[in-house]
Amino acid sequence: MTFSRPSGRTADQLRPVRIERAFTRHAEGSVLVSFGDTHVLCTASVENRVPNFLRGKGEGWVTAEYGMLPRSTHTRSDREAARGKQGGRTLEIQRLIGRALRACVDRNALGERTITLDCDVLQADGGTRTAAITGAYVALADAVNLLLKRGEIKKHPLIGAVAAVSVGIYRGEPVLDLDYPEDSDCDTDMNVVMNDGGGFIELQGTAEGHAFRRDELNALLALAEKGMGDLFALQRAALAG
């Protein structure tokens, strides 16, 4: 039996990825990133203050918030603000985004400033956290480039690019960049965050059905590395445009 994906993509093929910069007017950096039918708005906001634990140390901070619009999925969900607290999934994802982006920043070069990346899912079709990281990096780059242009910082604080992609085992086959039909029916789901030097920043992998073997893990990481090459090229092209 011939293996096929619901989307018709090959096992090592990303969804169509678009990165649109300067999507909003007020933020120092803003990007609409699309991985197929997953659309995430990422904005970077600069504030001349840092959390209390960093005051007087000459270091900056990079953090993130994440949320989904009520009708970003098939059925409406109440806003978390209406519930009075953020859910565990939201907290986990925004911490992941913050960790990923801090890994590419020289915080001493940033000075005592905070850059907050707000990642709002407009439409979800799988891979929202990986799309958010990939788009938020471009928004962050635009924000720090603006600080350099204004003369507010002297040294570029970015020490490399960061992107993320999902991989998984779907119907027994390792695949790249799962959409919702695959994500909801896969045996293994993994999110991979890397820098453009080939280093791994974070791996989040779970066997949803059958346990995965070491050779399957190696195949998933190889797929992720291939996808990262494409994503870093798209980020560079967007920032050069």
Curated annotation (Swiss-Prot):
Look up the record and give one Gene Ontology term from the biological process aspect.
Answer: rRNA catabolic process
InterPro entries from the UniProt entry: ExoRNase_PH_dom1, ExoRNase_PH_dom2, ExoRNase_PH_dom2_sf, PNPase/RNase_PH_dom_sf, Ribosomal_Su5_D2-typ_SF, RNase_PH, RNase_PH_bac-type, RNase_PH_CS
Keywords, ordered alphabetically: Nucleotidyltransferase, RNA-binding, rRNA processing, Transferase, tRNA processing, tRNA-binding
Annotated catalysed reactions: tRNA(n+1) + phosphate = tRNA(n) + a ribonucleoside 5'-diphosphate
Q: Which PROSITE patterns match?
A: RIBONUCLEASE_PH (PS01277)
Matches recorded under Pfam families: RNase_PH, RNase_PH_C
Q: What is its EC number?
A: 2.7.7.56
Q: Per its UniProt entry, what is the enzyme's top EC class, as one word?
A: transferase
Superkingdom field: Bacteria
Q: Which GO terms describe its molecular function?
A: 3'-5'-RNA exonuclease activity; tRNA binding; tRNA nucleotidyltransferase activity
Q: Which Gene3D superfamilies match?
A: GHMP Kinase, N-terminal domain
Query: Where on this chain does phosphate bind?
Result: R89, G127, T128, R129
The protein's assembly and partners = Homohexameric ring arranged as a trimer of dimers.
The record's listing under NCBIfam families reads: RNasePH
Q: Give the family per the record.
A: Belongs to the RNase PH family.
Per the entry, what this protein does is: Phosphorolytic 3'-5' exoribonuclease that plays an important role in tRNA 3'-end maturation. Removes nucleotide residues following the 3'-CCA terminus of tRNAs; can also add nucleotides to the ends of RNA molecules by using nucleoside diphosphates as substrates, but this may not be physiologically important. Probably plays a role in initiation of 16S rRNA degradation (leading to ribosome degradation) during starvation.
Q: What is this protein called?
A: Ribonuclease PH
Identify the species of origin: Xanthomonas oryzae pv. oryzae (strain PXO99A)
